[in-house]
């Protein structure tokens, strides 16, 4: 629970910073205390109370105007968010991810590439580079499932579903001549589909079959 509380401290701090609050840390402490009171009064978990307080604050007209962040050109997902990185790519947003990356390398590479970090690690959010806003970052509650993570990222940055990228590496997809790649297409698929794409980075072949239709529906649902 302490990690979740720290994570929400970072979210409250970012929200208040964007609203140019003067007594920043006092404001964060007051919001945490308010969540504790709500938890005790309504008999709900502190995590639920923190979420409710944040959503209430973020939905206020003043904060809605100041809270929307500019859409990043590149995300960098921490080691535990491989699934989220794939879904962001499918939605047309470039997202880096490496399973074996440590925190120091994550910070260094994100700064070099001007990437926005996505993390479930509240302790990482305590790093000075993130606290001071040198590197843009968003903390995601670790209790969220992948679709909920995606929905939160979409809401925080006002993202839209764009042209899909390679879900494996994030490369742009380039239209291919069907006959030129015939040997790479499964025979049954070749007979009923004419449009194919290859990743400009890794060369992986894609087509919009029934699997993609399901993915597309879920992406648009997350964007609502």
Predicted segment positions?
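Cys/His-clustered metal-coordination modules, chiefly Zn-binding fingers
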Residues: 132-224
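Long, charged N-terminal interaction/targeting segments
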Residues: 11, 26-31, 51-161
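General structural signal for secondary-structure boundaries
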Residues: 42-45, 102, 177, 186
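SAM-dependent methyltransferases
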Residues: 39, 43, 47-69, 214-217, ...
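Helix-enriched interaction subdomains in cytosolic or periplasmic regions
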Residues: 9-51
């Amino acid at each position: 629970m302490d990690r979740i509380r720290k994570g929400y401290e970072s979210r409250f701090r970012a929200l208040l910073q964007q609203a140019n609050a003067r007594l920043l840390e006092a404001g964060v402490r007051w919001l945490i205390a308010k969540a504790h009171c709500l938890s005790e009064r309504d008999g709900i978990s502190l995590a639920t109370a923190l979420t409710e307080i944040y959503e209430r604050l973020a939905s206020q007209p003043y904060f809605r105007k100041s809270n929307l962040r500019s859409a990043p050109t590149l995300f960098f997902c921490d080691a535990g968010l491989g699934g989220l990185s794939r879904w962001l790519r499918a939605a047309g947003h470039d997202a880096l991810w490496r399973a074996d990356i440590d925190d120091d390398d994550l910070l260094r590479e994100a700064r070099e590439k001007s990437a926005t970090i996505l993390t479930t690690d509240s302790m990482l959010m305590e790093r000075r580079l993130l606290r001071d806003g040198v590197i843009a970052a968003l903390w995601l509650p670790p209790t969220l499932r992948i679709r909920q993570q995606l929905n939160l990222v979409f809401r925080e940055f006002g993202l839209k579903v764009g042209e899909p990228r390679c879900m494996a590496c994030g490369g742009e997809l380039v239209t291919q001549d069907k006959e030129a790649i015939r040997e790479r297409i499964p025979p049954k698929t070749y007979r009923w589909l004419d449009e194919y794409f290859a990743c400009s980075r890794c060369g992986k072949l894609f087509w919009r079959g029934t699997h993609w239709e399901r993915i597309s529906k879920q992406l648009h649902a997350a964007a609502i």
